[in-house]
Amino acid sequence: MNREEKKELVSELNSLFGEASACVVTHYKGMTVAELEQLRKGMRAAGASFRVTKNRITRLALADTPFEGLADLFTGPTAIAISKDPVAPAKVCVEFAKKNEKLVILGGAMQGNVLDKQGIEALAKLPSLDELRGRLIGMITTPATRIAGVTQAPAAQLARVFNAYATKEEAA
């Protein structure tokens, strides 16, 4: 890889770090290509990406980004999981690491806050942004639905009383 390609890669990674809200740093030593592809597939499904990068290039790309504090983690065979969703890369990495001991989570960051391995595991237990939005909308619409039901109930009860009275009159 020549100097121009390296500069281009640093620029690409820097913009990727600038747009992301979460990053997880992992060691992948001993994993097969098939296992890495399976992990990448899981990341794509969650809206994240998993990349193996050169440590020096990644450290350079971290400059002037919210993830600058992660530079010390880049030693040995490292890979990054990155996403705009703050929970997605952590969830996929933790889930995959439970099944495959070769994937070691070193740490990560979320919106500028550096997290250790335990922090990433705690982050993985949180619901995703879409799940939280769904819950919030459910909480907002539930009272309106109940109010509509309560306001319609007296009219329905009154209609049933009139109907019962009418059928009683017809029967008599």
Swiss-Prot record:
Gene Ontology biological process terms from the UniProt entry: translation
Domain of life of the native organism: Bacteria
Alphabetical list of InterPro entries matching this protein: Ribosomal_uL10 (IPR001790), Ribosomal_uL10-like_sf (IPR043141), Ribosomal_uL10_bac (IPR022973), Ribosomal_uL10_bac_type (IPR047865), Ribosomal_uL10_CS_bac (IPR002363)
GO molecular function: large ribosomal subunit rRNA binding; structural constituent of ribosome
GO cellular component labels: large ribosomal subunit
Keywords tagged on the record: Ribonucleoprotein, Ribosomal protein, RNA-binding, rRNA-binding
Pfam families assigned: Ribosomal_L10
Subunit structure: Part of the ribosomal stalk of the 50S ribosomal subunit. The N-terminus interacts with L11 and the large rRNA to form the base of the stalk. The C-terminus forms an elongated spine to which L12 dimers bind in a sequential fashion forming a multimeric L10(L12)X complex.
Family to which the UniProt record says this protein belongs: Belongs to the universal ribosomal protein uL10 family.
Summary of the function given for this chain in its UniProt record: Forms part of the ribosomal stalk, playing a central role in the interaction of the ribosome with GTP-bound translation factors.
Protein known as: Large ribosomal subunit protein uL10
Naturally occurring in which organism (per UniProt): Rhodospirillum rubrum (strain ATCC 11170 / ATH 1.1.1 / DSM 467 / LMG 4362 / NCIMB 8255 / S1)
Species lineage: Bacteria, Pseudomonadati, Pseudomonadota, Alphaproteobacteria, Rhodospirillales
